[in-house]
């Protein structure tokens, strides 16, 4: 999957929802992480991409940004059963 397609999938995640790295790039979750680490696009909703277990990257404003969009948490993890978005044809949705 090329970078443009990865970015399109991330842009398709609606406010209040999240996708796991593996939802963005099925079978290659690290590819999504690599693209996010290399692209500096101001309007890209990077905070909507989380780990499959709902945990977040450390040291970023991710939790604050997700809460502002109404994403629900269970402790420090996103409630994936409620907040996971479909992201392409192979993504799982609640």
Where are these regions (language model features)?
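Nucleic acid-binding interface residues in structured DNA/RNA-binding domains
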Residues: 1-94
């Amino acid at each position: 999957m090329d970078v443009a397609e990865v970015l399109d999938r991330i842009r398709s995640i609606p406010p209040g929802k999240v996708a796991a790295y593996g939802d963005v790039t099925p079978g290659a979750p690290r590819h999504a992480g690599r693209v996010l680490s290399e692209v500096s696009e101001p309007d890209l909703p990077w905070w909507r991409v989380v780990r499959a277990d709902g945990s977040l990257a450390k040291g970023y404003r991710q939790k604050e940004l997700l809460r502002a969009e109404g994403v629900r948490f269970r402790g420090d993890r996103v409630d994936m059963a409620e907040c996971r978005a479909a992201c392409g044809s192979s993504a799982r949705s609640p």
